[in-house]
């Protein structure tokens, strides 16, 4: 079998493997003008002309402005695309003085701004790139997932630059497709030479004198390619194939671990939203130490493309989870790249909170007065058009909403009206939970206030600034509030639930909650 057939067969095998995922999607090809990406573009053109490939990808070239020749390269790619009747988009950037990783991230972000949701980007990464990626991650102490290196098909999400993000628009996601991961650089070189492909050689990708270490003049990947790997393959000729096979085995092992973690997480998770996730420590303790570590590793950075936590952070979280003293005030901070998080413990629960959300929790709710005026002949409600009440000031990153306010007030007004035709005017008041008022939770004995009440509400210390009391206050005929003895506490609103208080309206509030007429939620603005 000749080299060109190997290359085209590898591409078609990958195409058939991901045919269902490609259906209905627009396909792009990242083309630097180098041997790998230009060879891939030529192959796509050939397969399309032969009727074997049902689409012709659109080329994207990023002119990153880091070298004097970049403008010339962009022009060369555009001319090649025109000659081969392939659409091509040139993106201009200035990534001068950026690190290797920052420049790579910048190129991806620029391409994603051009692409639509769920578009596919073909990349020319090959077996030698896979080996370099594996070695770089190995030298940085990566675990099983990291040593899986690059996957043939994976998703990538954009880091949103909008603050606050638009919750009505999902964070952009594209798919990366690498059909040549089993093809070597030498095979691609031979293919390019067979077709007289005039590709670009980036001088920063190789050493001028590979016999020297060139530590100062080469980036990490180029140093591995030009200096270290030639010595390895001289001693072990099959090293590249063996290391690429190791990456595949690591991917399989990582998938197996992920399946186990998913099952374990379903057992230990108490609640999970984008803002916070809670796990039960007694159930976590029932897992073996390796499964505990794997679960925490996944739990700390649960979304695609987030930076994986270090082993040190995982160990610190496990130490916090199982410490025996009563001091649970420790807060661990970490940056997952796309999000910053806090990890806190309260009693036998472990919380992962978005850092911005944790700060928002400390902002006090504002006081709200809703008059409820009625008489025996006519019922009138002073309500806004909306049925939703925001419990904290607007303009913040999150909106804490109480839904069903109109229904609540209508039911209260009818009960009061039917009980006494001459009942005095009333109003609903929502306010931060006073620490001095003793309240009785429905279905429980005794009255509590302050810290004991908050403990009964199962509220962690870091959430106690976001607790609201709803009470019904009676007003005199002159419209002035009477003394506090005429107030009827109805319920307490916490971040995650509503607690009903003992009153003559307990049955009504319970019914509204059971039918989900009355509910609370937090939205990201």
Swiss-Prot record:
Pfam family, one: ATP_bind_3
Enzyme Commission designation: 6.3.4.19
GO biological process entries: tRNA modification
Reactions that this protein is recorded to catalyse: cytidine(34) in tRNA(Ile2) + L-lysine + ATP = lysidine(34) in tRNA(Ile2) + AMP + diphosphate + H(+)
Domain of life: Bacteria
Keyword tRNA processing listed: yes
Gene3D superfamilies: 1.20.59.20, HUPs
Family annotation (InterPro entries): Rossmann-like_a/b/a_fold, TilS/TtcA_N, tRNA_Ile_lys_synt, tRNA_Ile_lys_synt_N, tRNA_Ile_lys_synt_subst-bd
Chain segments annotated as transmembrane: none
Source species: Psychrobacter sp. (strain PRwf-1)
Cell location: Cytoplasm
Encoding gene (name): tilS
A GO term for molecular function: tRNA(Ile)-lysidine synthase activity
Keywords recorded for this protein, A-Z: ATP-binding, Cytoplasm, Ligase, Nucleotide-binding, tRNA processing
First-tier enzyme category under EC: ligase
Entry's free-text remark on domains: The N-terminal region contains the highly conserved SGGXDS motif, predicted to be a P-loop motif involved in ATP binding.
SUPFAM superfamilies: Adenine nucleotide alpha hydrolases-like, MesJ substrate recognition domain-like
Protein name: tRNA(Ile)-lysidine synthase
């Amino acid at each position: 079998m000749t080299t060109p057939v190997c290359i085209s067969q590898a591409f078609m095998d990958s195409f058939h493997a991901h045919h269902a995922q490609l259906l209905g999607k627009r396909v792009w090809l990242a083309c630097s003008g180098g041997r790998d990406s230009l060879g891939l573009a030529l192959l796509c053109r050939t397969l399309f002309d032969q009727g074997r490939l049902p689409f012709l990808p659109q080329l994207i070239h990023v002119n990153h402005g880091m070298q004097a020749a970049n403008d010339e390269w962009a022009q060369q790619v555009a001319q090649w695309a025109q000659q081969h009747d392939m659409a091509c988009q040139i993106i201009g950037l200035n990534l001068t003085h950026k690190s290797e990783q920052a420049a790579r991230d910048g190129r991806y972000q620029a391409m994603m701004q051009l692409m639509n949701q769920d578009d596919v980007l073909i990349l020319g990464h090959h077996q030698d790139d896979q080996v370099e990626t594996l070695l770089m991650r190995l030298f940085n102490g990566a675990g099983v997932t990291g040593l899986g290196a690059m996957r043939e098909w994976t998703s990538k999400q954009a880091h949103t630059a909008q603050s606050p993000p638009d919750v009505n628009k999902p964070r952009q996601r594209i798919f990366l497709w690498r059909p040549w991961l089993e093809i070597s650089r030498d095979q691609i070189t031979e293919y390019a030479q067979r077709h007289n492909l005039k590709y670009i050689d980036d001088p920063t990708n190789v050493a001028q004198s590979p016999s020297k270490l060139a530590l100062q003049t080469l980036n990490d990947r180029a140093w591995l390619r030009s200096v270290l790997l030639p010595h390895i393959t001289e001693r072990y000729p099959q090293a590249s194939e063996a290391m690429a096979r190791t990456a595949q085995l690591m991917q399989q092992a990582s998938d197996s671990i992920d399946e186990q973690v998913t099952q374990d997480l379903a057992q230990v998770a108490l609640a999970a939203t984008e803002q916070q996730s809670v796990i039960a420590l007694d159930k976590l303790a029932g897992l073996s130490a390796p499964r505990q570590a794997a679960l925490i590793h996944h739990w700390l950075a649960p979304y695609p493309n987030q930076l994986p936590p270090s082993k040190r952070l995982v160990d610190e979280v496990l130490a916090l989870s199982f410490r025996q003293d009563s001091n649970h005030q420790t807060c661990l901070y970490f940056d997952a790249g796309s999000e910053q998080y806090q990890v806190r413990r309260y009693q036998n629960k472990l919380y992962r909170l978005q850092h911005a959300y944790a700060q928002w929790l400390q902002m006090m709710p504002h006081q709200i007065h809703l008059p409820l005026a009625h008489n025996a002949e006519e019922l009138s409600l002073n309500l806004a058009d909306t049925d939703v009440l925001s419990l904290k000031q607007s303009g913040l990153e999150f909106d804490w909403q109480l839904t069903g306010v109109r229904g609540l007030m209508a039911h209260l007004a009818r009960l009061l009206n039917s009980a006494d035709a001459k009942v005095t005017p009333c109003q609903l008041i929502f306010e931060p939970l006073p620490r001095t008022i003793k309240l009785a939770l429905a279905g429980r004995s005794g009255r509590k206030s302050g810290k004991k009440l908050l403990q009964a509400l199962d509220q962690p210390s870091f959430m106690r600034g976001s607790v609201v009391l709803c009470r019904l206050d009676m007003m005199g005929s002159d419209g002035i509030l009477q003394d506090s003895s005429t107030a009827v506490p109805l319920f307490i609103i916490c971040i995650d639930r509503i607690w009903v208080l003992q009153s003559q309206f307990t049955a009504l509030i319970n019914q509204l909650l059971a039918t989900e007429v009355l509910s609370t939620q937090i939205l990201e603005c």
